[in-house]
A protein has these predicted regions:
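Helix-turn-helix
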Residues: 2, 6, 10, 14-48, ...
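Amphipathic alpha-helical interface segments
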Residues: 10, 14, 89, 93, ...
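Short coil/turn segments at alpha/beta junctions that flank glycine-rich nucleotide-binding fingerprints
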Residues: 17-21, 97, 140
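Alpha-helical DNA-contacting segments of helix-turn-helix folds
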Residues: 51-57, 61-64
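Hydrophobic alpha-helical connector segments
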Residues: 52, 66-96, 151, 155-158, ...
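Secondary-structure edge/capping motif, primarily at the C-terminal ends of alpha-helices
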Residues: 69-72, 101-108, 165-172
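Short secondary-structure transition hinges
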Residues: 88-131, 142-143
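Hydrophobic alpha-helical bundle segments that form small-molecule/ligand-binding pockets
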Residues: 112, 123-158, 192-197
């Protein structure tokens, strides 16, 4: 990790431990073990630091999820295992980290308030990458889409389902979230497609 990535990781932990509203740049510098001047060299405000946190997390989970999906595809895993793993890393890692924070609702609220452009961009890039991975699965003969469903529609449904799982009123615990992604993925996949050869 670069020094900047380490700083943003420390910023992430600081917001999770202390919340957004009461945070100041002075406190953030102290929690990150950096001078205020050093922090201001990178960010002009706590809002910018928070946005950097969201960007880095989105990049980390996007790359990690696609790496895991590609690894499973190469290992010959079935489509449900691949899709579950991709969604679990992309959305579940953040959820598991957030539920440990006493400021989870506050951090989540500010992420939606302050970081919508970053979140939309991350979703757009991830969904295009996820579609490419699913195209490989289809090309391998592991999945056949129904004629009325496009790959983009399938990806949108799966991602909406994962985000909905995270935001549901009866949200699963950290231990249950992988199974919930699997159940949701199975319902969507085999309502939109059928296993190849059937």
């Amino acid at each position: 990790m670069s020094a900047y990535e380490v700083l943003v990781s420390n910023i992430t932990q600081s917001f999770l431990d202390h919340g957004y509203e009461a945070m100041t740049m002075s406190k953030l510098a102290k929690y990150c073990n950096i001078t205020r001047r050093g922090l201001y060299h990178h960010f002009s405000s706590k809002e910018e630091a928070f946005q950097a946190m969201v960007r880095q997390n989105n990049q980390r989970t996007r790359l990690g999820s696609l790496s895991e999906g590609t690894r499973l595809l190469s290992a010959g895993a079935d489509v449900l295992d691949i899709v579950t793993a991709v969604l679990d890393v992309r959305y579940g890692d953040t959820r598991r980290k957030l539920v440990l924070s006493p400021f989870a609702l506050e951090v989540n609220d500010y992420a939606f308030r302050l970081c919508r452009p970053e979140m939309v961009e991350a979703a757009t890039v991830f969904q295009a990458n996820f579609a490419a991975l699913l195209q490989q699965i289809i090309a391998n003969g592991q999945l056949t889409l129904r004629p009325t469903i496009s790959i983009e529609t399938l990806v949108q449904l799966l991602c909406d389902g994962a985000r909905g799982t995270n935001q549901s009123f009866f949200a699963p615990s950290s231990e249950e979230i992988t199974a919930r992604y699997r159940q949701m993925s199975q319902a969507i996949l085999f309502g939109c497609a059928e296993p190849a050869g059937l």
